Amino acid sequence: MLIVADENIPLLDAFFEGFGEIRRYPGRSMDAASVKEADVLLVRSVTKVDRQLLEGSRVRFVGTCTIGTDHLDLDYFAEAGIHWSSAPGCNARGVVDYVLGSLLTLADLDGAALPQRTYGVVGAGEVGGRLVRVLHGMGWKVLVCDPLRQAAEGGDFVSLQTVLEQCDVISLHTPLQQGGEHPTWHLLGQAQLAQLRPGAWLINASRGPVVDNLALRELLLDREDVHAVLDVWEGEPQVDLQLADLCTLATPHIAGYSLDGRQRGTAQIYQALCRFLGEAERVQLQDLLPKPPLAQIEFDGEADLGWALATLCRAVYDPRRDDADFRRSLSDDAAEQRAAFDLLRKQYPPRREIEGLAVRLRGEAPQLVQMVNALGAVVV
């Protein structure tokens, strides 16, 4: 069996060497010649997998180590009898950690009290749903917009218009859909962005085209009160340099790039391939994950809640480092800038998740316990 894989997928040998030969290619440069002889194709979101890539090949299984599937032509897969699998939820926790770190940074700059803000989460799937649970667990006010879930479940969902009108913070976690009943391409365009509340914070860690980047650039030029955090960009790896400069935080599509999340994505695709082939799983992720460099943190029961929240979250992840690295990489030379974007992702340093952290509390601290539990860390 021949497996063709994106060279940046972690743990390829550990999970897949038992199936046969593995050939690695840069994800953005995979072409029909690269995959013609492959039986299995493993990709990330940077590879468009469609008829043009696969027609005439031997590929019968496509695995993407990502939550999103907008880079896969699922209609063609069905027509050609190609089995496929994604990795739902693999990096959800990493994205939540990114959002929390961004909120702390914005609060420092704005002087805003996080518990007193109203949060709007647009898209409540694997990532957005987990963020909603964390924010609710903190006791913060959250409005949720997800028309697909609303249609299926009913429940306490609101419209996008309500989010725009009532929320101080808007965090986007939708898939990218250009058609259908609920398209998300330019979900926030000029008209929607104009309705942002005074002093609003906008976070996009979903897909770049969910926000009209040109309209956002014009808004930020006109309104200094609005803070934008962008991890995803229209046309990436090409980036609108002026928009990046106007953003309060700007990063190169790494919100979900925790070590745990990336390796979890590989594990999920491995499990799917085992099911497809009818083979038993011989490798377990828990045997491959290294121990985190920080395993436990301790607080006094009298610790200030805001300080404890910032200390706990930033002990695991602080987006300001990624923002600084990204800004240093930006270049007026388009080719250099695209290469730097991909290099930052390829060489991204190991980053762990807050759920792997144990917290010891000295004395009675019910509010701290609630906060730690909401974040997903473990009180010991």
Curated annotation (Swiss-Prot):
Chief location bin: cytoplasm
GO cellular component, one term: cytosol
Example of a GO MF term: protein dimerization activity
SUPFAM superfamilies reported for this sequence: Formate/glycerate dehydrogenase catalytic domain-like, NAD(P)-binding Rossmann-fold domains
Superkingdom: Bacteria
Record pathway: Cofactor biosynthesis; pyridoxine 5'-phosphate biosynthesis; pyridoxine 5'-phosphate from D-erythrose 4-phosphate: step 2/5
Catalytic residues of the enzyme: R207, E236, H253
Enzyme Commission code(s) on record: 1.1.1.290
Catalytic reaction(s) noted: 4-phospho-D-erythronate + NAD(+) = (R)-3-hydroxy-2-oxo-4-phosphooxybutanoate + NADH + H(+)
Keywords for the protein's UniProt record, in alphabetical order: Cytoplasm, NAD, Oxidoreductase, Pyridoxine biosynthesis
One GO biological process term: pyridoxine biosynthetic process
Binding site for substrate: S45, T66, Y257
Keyword NAD included in the entry's annotation: yes
Family to which this protein belongs: Belongs to the D-isomer specific 2-hydroxyacid dehydrogenase family. PdxB subfamily.
Assembly with partners or alone: Homodimer.
Protein name: Erythronate-4-phosphate dehydrogenase
Gene: pdxB
